[in-house]
Swiss-Prot record:
Gene: Crb3
Intrachain disulfide bonds: none
Function text: Involved in the establishment of cell polarity in mammalian epithelial cells. Regulates the morphogenesis of tight junctions. Involved in promoting phosphorylation and cytoplasmic retention of transcriptional coactivators YAP1 and WWTR1/TAZ which leads to suppression of TGFB1-dependent transcription of target genes such as CCN2/CTGF, SERPINE1/PAI1, SNAI1/SNAIL1 and SMAD7.
Name of the protein: Protein crumbs homolog 3
Main location: membrane
Lineage, uppermost ranks: Eukaryota, Metazoa, Chordata, Craniata, Vertebrata
Residues in compartment: Extracellular: 25-49
Amino acid sequence: MATPGLGVLLAFGLPMLPSGWSLTAPDPFTNSTTQPPGDESNGGLSSGAIVAITVVFSILGVLLIAVGLFLLMRKLREKRQTEGTYRPSSEEQVGARAPPPPNLKLPPEERLI
């Protein structure tokens, strides 16, 4: 099943493809030889474009790793809170060491009717 993002990518990406990538059949009566790439050829990407693409994908990769680490840390903290051992004896010992509060009033005496 295709995701909705794939449709958007195809809708906007296909018109941007170079015309040289079209699926039309070549004309058999024309010369289809190409010149070897040289300094004057404009067919490849410039070094500035390559640097820009590298920088963009590097930033996206770093952001993806940062988001992944953030989600991993959040999941580990959640797991640490929900899983563990319960030791009531240690809580009882801590409560026994605390002195009783001063001026503790007794509850009212219950009487029979």
